[in-house]
């Protein structure tokens, strides 16, 4: 990292960038762990690759006009996406094309990712129900709101999607690396579920915050 440099022929550059420091583990070259004594303890000064999970800390669902559905209608923090059809409209009323937002502990996430190169981003999410027994399609966007807002907002629309072939079940959904880069840089604060269509293939709901192992979380692989 900043304490370990190499000469590239023109100038001194950080050695860890690009994983230039390697060691042979008996079968392949892997990133080397380099430490130095700072007078009190050993500290790592080479780049390493880490994979960490970041659970959601809040979730909210909204109606088609962007209005907050209310805690009692969310049924214990469900994340809704899409518009349901009849007879549910007659029974429940018409909420239009529903959408959801989820956020993280941004202070912790940004501290962990500060100065990091993002390698991979995955979202764990568990479906509770699709309109069709044959499954449906999840559409993931992004937002830039720190706390749960009264109105739905979105900064990126449909940046990733994933299909289910049955009603219920969980998935790890690969998201674009720029999403974690935006989180790292404070340009995004969480993800959205939103697809601007009345197609019932997109109607479903998912476990939100407070559901233990079934709650959404990000898994980010990064080098720093």
Language model regions located:
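Enriched but not universal
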Residues: 1-48, 219-223
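Flexible, small-residue-rich N-terminal segments that precede or flank a structured functional core
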Residues: 22, 35, 42-108, 195, ...
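Cysteine-clustered segments with highest specificity for TGF-beta superfamily mature ligands
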Residues: 77-84, 88, 105, 151-224
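Extracellular/lumenal carbohydrate-interaction signature centered on repeated Trp-anchored short motifs
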Residues: 95, 108-120, 182-185
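Extracellular structured ligand-interaction cores
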Residues: 99-101, 118-120, 135-137, 170, ...
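A short beta-strand element within beta-rich, extracytoplasmic domains
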Residues: 104-106, 114-130, 218
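Extended, low-complexity, turn-rich repeat/linker tracts enriched in Gly/Pro/Ser/Thr and Asp/Glu
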Residues: 125-136, 200
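Short, surface-exposed beta-strand/strand-loop-strand elements in extracellular ectodomains
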Residues: 133-147
